[in-house]
Amino acid sequence: MSNVTPKLVWPEDDYVDESLLEDHQGPARLEYDALVMLANLPPLTEEIMSRCPALPVKTRSTPEYTLVLDLDETLVHCSLTPLDNATMVFPVVFQNITYQVYVRLRPHLRTFLSRMAKTFEIIIFTASKKVYANKLCDILDPRKNHIRHRLFREHCVCVFGNYVKDLTILGRDPSKTMILDNAVQSFAYQLDNGIPIESWFHDRNDTELLKLCSFLEAIPTLGRDVREILRHKYRLRDHIPFYSIIHQQEGPGRLPLLEVAPPPVTEPNDEQLITQVVQKHPQLVQG
């Protein structure tokens, strides 16, 4: 049973007039953990920077631009406990134990993958284990019409217990590479290549993927560095005034890990969080 790949019956998404959709803006605010992670991000080690690319070189038929996609809470929501309205269930064997994985698909995923594959080299890059993610990709794209490559947890860099997706492992032109992920800290080393998206769990009225289609399809026609476009659109650095300060610190003189207190029960906004860090660590804003 564990070797059988279930056939996916795609759910019918409600029709949405794209012309009426608002422009995609990403999350309204960054999570507290993401702010702390980005403020403390250490430089990549020489060992990591000298890694060989995990992907084969492009062929002539490979699209010029690359779109890296996260899986969990970006394209799907999965659980080992039963989910209401699960689209499918599939078995995964891990350490000789069979688990049933319940899957919900984010609305408009099929349309998104189909359209993006016409314009981009699609790569799945997930912090999940290969035994689970590989099987899920086989179900989502059994004929490999959309997803060209897959990278998993072993391809991530572990930083303070977080799995970070260093895009240099792709061996692709950074000026033509983007990553879509619900966790900003996942692309912390290439912040300007990132497209942040709200985490998805169950909302059947979600249109985030559909909002992105026209925007992404237009990018290759502009002939510009994608980092300039995404930096201007999402302005992630505006949320993190410490980002450039921290990245100027290298070697023994680097600032120590910030011991930022956890947020109170009523979560503060980004400005309040930043004020908390500055008050506790004034050296960050000195000279």
Curated annotation (Swiss-Prot):
Record carries keyword Secreted: no
Domain of life: Eukaryota
Enzyme Commission identifier(s): 3.1.3.-
Family annotation (InterPro entries): Dullard_phosphatase, FCP1_dom, HAD-like_sf, HAD_sf, TIM50
SUPFAM superfamilies with a match to the protein in the record: HAD-like (SSF56784)
Molecular function GO labels: phosphoprotein phosphatase activity
PROSITE patterns cross-referenced by the UniProt entry: FCP1
Domain FCP1 homology: 60-219
UniProt cross-references to SMART domains, sorted A to Z: CPDc
Pfam families: NIF (PF03031)
Keywords attached to this entry: Hydrolase, Protein phosphatase
PANTHER family noted in UniProt: DULLARD PROTEIN PHOSPHATASE
Function: Probable phosphatase.
Similarity-based family: Belongs to the CTDSPL2 family.
Designated name of the protein: CTD small phosphatase-like protein 3
